[in-house]
From Swiss-Prot:
Organism: Caenorhabditis elegans
Protein's UniProt name: Uncharacterized protein ZC412.3
Glycosylation sites: 48, 159, 223, 239
Domain of life: Eukaryota
Signal peptide (from-to): 1-17
Record's keyword terms, sorted: Glycoprotein, Secreted, Signal
Length: 250
């Protein structure tokens, strides 16, 4: 009889509806609820009367369900439901492939800032594309091209700095005078009434004026008198002028 009672008791226990308890709520076996608007919890019961709740996934802000250990790209964001060995689950969010860049540019959009072109790449990452010369010449990143007749290298360095500079030594370029002759860096030469000096990148800069009756170069904004003639070499802004004045009375 005692045995039957025990059996009866076991039978009664096994037929009782076992439920999970979570935050003061009763949950049926296999019932799934969402908590904290971010996690999916499932009730699991056993015939022996034991039960447990298990986090089986996450829920994104827009309601998309993600199983634990998986990730999904929703719009311009990637949501990952991470489950650790200890059973802790966390919902992580990162930029998706089509995310916008920090400046608001859309995925794939190109734009120019001063002399540099950029593109909004995957994950909202700004990608350096090319250098642009004043004449509109474009040199792709990492390459060398010609701008204004000079070899220019367009480069992004490891620290993120972007440079557009002469590919060769600035002093290695020759200047070309109006008569077609070549002048070395540092060499002075006469063109009409002006004296030029060959500078870096092959740029001939006016350093003074020239007069047949004056032995030396007349400096900028200086006057030199030879006989009864005054020779004047002046600069006004970016304009240079050479003039002569007679000291003879009319």
């Amino acid at each position: 009889m005692r045995t039957l009672v025990l059996l009866s008791s076991v039978a009664i226990l096994s037929t009782l509806a076992v439920k999970c308890k979570y935050d003061g709520k009763d949950l049926e076996n296999n019932e799934v609820i969402t908590v904290q608007n971010a996690f999916r919890i499932k009730c699991l019961t056993e015939d022996n009367g034991s039960w447990k709740t298990e986090i089986i996934g996450c829920v994104t802000p827009d309601g998309t369900e993600i199983n634990a250990g998986e990730k999904k790209e929703v719009g311009d964001k990637v949501h990952e439901c991470v489950k650790s060995e200890s059973g802790q689950v966390s919902l992580k969010e990162s930029k998706g492939r089509t995310a916008a860049c920090p400046g608001g540019q859309k995925h794939g959009e190109q734009w120019q800032e001063k002399s540099f072109k950029f593109r909004c790449g995957d994950g909202g990452v700004v990608k350096f594309e090319a250098c642009v010369g004043q004449d509109g010449s474009v040199i792709p990143a990492g390459e060398t091209g010609k701008i204004g007749g000079f070899d220019v290298k367009c480069e992004q360095h490891a620290n993120g700095t972007i440079t557009m500079q002469a590919a060769n030594d600035p002093k290695s370029y020759d200047c070309t005078a109006k008569d077609g002759s070549s002048k070395k860096n540092g060499e002075e030469y006469v063109e009409g009434n002006f004296v030029r000096k060959c500078g870096d990148y092959g740029q001939g800069k006016i350093i003074g004026c020239h007069a047949e009756n004056v032995g030396n170069t007349i400096g900028i904004n200086q006057n030199v008198t030879s006989g009864d003639i005054v020779y004047s070499c002046t600069k006004d802004g970016s304009n240079y002028s050479f003039k002569t004045y007679s000291l003879k009375a009319n």
